[in-house]
Regions:
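Active-site bordering "gate/hinge" segments
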Residues: 1-264, 395, 401-403, 411-413
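Short solvent-exposed loop/turn micro-motifs enriched in small/polar/acidic residues
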Residues: 15, 206-208, 276-279, 313, ...
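Dual-mode signal for accessory low-complexity, basic/Gly-rich regions
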Residues: 294-363
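Long, well-ordered mid-to-C-terminal structural blocks that present hydrophobic/aromatic surfaces
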Residues: 256-310
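Extended hydrophobic packing segments that form well-structured cores
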Residues: 368-413
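Active-site lining segments that contact anionic ligands and/or coordinate catalytic metals
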Residues: 262-264, 280-282, 289-292, 315-319, ...
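A short secondary-structure junction signal
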Residues: 112-115, 155-160, 236-237, 278-281, ...
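Short linear motifs in exposed loops
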Residues: 225, 295-296, 406
Length: 413
């Protein structure tokens, strides 16, 4: 298989990411995080950003092989300390209100077999050191977009029966272009129409201001409280400078934060999770009074336990997102082993930090005020997928009346 018009579509994709995703404006600083394998796309993104008037584009290259070797051989005292130059770079980006574009293409199992203690220690250290950047991002002080590119090892996992490595990569690029509407005659208009549909769902939920959500499905019976004055968000967001951007490309979700003090019941994952270079399957979580009291996984059990019990704030939830099972990504029938795609095929929850914008006025609140409002504070934010065509969700009003939101995995109305 040779993907027709690949270079033309890759150029359209780069333009879409820069102009519509991150929405580069004259004078902007852009930080681009991208794998060395994606050099061609990186060059197109950099050219497009400067063409739109960016003053500086900083490329932060990543490499799965180098990263794995570091975890295999570096001593623990190096892994649980973040070098000063990384903190200095973060501060420079914050001072310049740099937009952040992350293009993900890593092998989902790049760190399989690496000592879980090393992974946990490094993730914890990075979470603490990068806290100012996380806060700026999660409160939309700066624009940020997460997108994807077809990495070889990732493509081989998604399409193991492809006739060749090249075909696997082409098949994955084809899915990325489809779900990001690159093939549409007018991709920008297609995104505007899609965003309007998602916004209508968010508007309905914001008007209702449900007190809680009740999820039921095989292996799931969970009630999540919602904070007062919570805000459901959808495709588009606005940064502190009043500029629009798209946090995720693709996206099919509407989302808010649950009240981290009010979660009771149990939930079972329905798709694999790729986290910290490991593929985790069969996650089961039990909640009582907002806290995770038990978590197990059929594969990657220790990685999940370390995530929840070794990181501050990771025993509670920071996000609940609604995605209908008939979404295009779900209907493709493909498991992508990549949260950006798999979360947009399924209802999902996030362990850890809530986005500040999930309550009215949250972007201007202190960490203490956000916590008092019911928004979980943590150094981690990890989505896991729980939806299926067997899931029902009810919205529960203050007076206890129930409104069907989802039936058999799709919007009830």
């Amino acid at each position: 298989m040779v993907l027709p018009n690949f270079k033309e579509n890759l150029e359209k994709y780069a333009q879409l990411l820069v102009a519509n995703g991150i929405n580069v404006q004259p004078g902007h600083t852009l930080a681009l995080s991208i794998d060395v394998e994606q050099r061609e796309l990186a060059h197109l993104i950099v050219k497009e950003a400067y063409a739109l008037g960016a003053h500086e584009v900083i490329v932060q290259w990543t490499d799965d092989v180098i990263n794995r070797e570091k975890f295999l051989h570096a001593p623990m005292e190096r892994l649980d300390n973040v070098p000063e130059y990384k903190i200095a770079e973060m501060n420079y980006l914050l001072e310049n209100k740099a937009s952040r574009l992350g293009v993900r293409s890593s092998d989902p199992g790049a760190l399989n077999g690496v000592d879980a203690d090393k992974l946990s220690a490094s993730a914890k250290a990075m979470g603490l050191a990068m806290k100012p950047m996380r806060i700026a991002t999660q409160s939309n002080k700066v624009s940020w977009t997460v997108a994807a590119a077809a990495g070889l090892e990732w493509a081989k996992k998604v399409f193991p029966n492809a006739a060749s490595d090249e075909e696997a990569v082409d098949l994955l690029w084809d899915q990325i272009f489809k779900t990001c509407r690159v093939y549409e005659e007018d991709p920008v208009k297609a995104w505007e129409d899609h965003a309007a549909i998602l916004k209508s769902k968010a508007d309905m939920l914001n008007k209702e201001q449900f007190s809680a959500l009740h999820y039921t499905a095989p292996g799931t019976d969970l009630t999540l409280g919602l904070p007062k004055n919570h805000v459901w968000e959808s495709a588009g967001a606005i940064n502190a400078q009043g500029e629009g951007f798209l946090p995720n490309m693709p996206t099919e979700e509407v989302f808010t934060a649950p009240d981290f003090r009010r979660a009771d019941g149990y939930v079972t994952s329905t798709k694999p999770l790729s986290y910290n270079g490991n593929i985790i399957e069969g996650i089961k979580v039990t909640f009582k009074d907002g806290q995770i009291v038990d978590i197990t996984a059929e594969k990657g059990d220790q990685v999940m336990k370390d995530l929840v019990f070794e990181n501050a704030g990771a025993r509670a939830l920071g996000e609940c997102a609604l995605v209908p099972d008939p979404s295009p990504i779900s209907q493709s029938g493909i498991t992508f082993f990549n949260t950006l795609f798999d979360e947009n095929a399924s209802n999902h929850l996030a362990i850890g930090a809530a986005y500040a914008t999930s309550v009215v006025g949250g972007a201007e609140m202190s960490e203490e005020e956000l916590e008092a409002a019911g928004l979980n504070r943590s150094d981690v934010h990890v989505d896991f997928m729980i939806g299926s065509n067997q899931m029902d969700i009810d919205g529960i009003r203050e007076d206890g009346t129930r409104v069907p939101l989802f039936r058999n995995g799709d919007w009830a109305n």
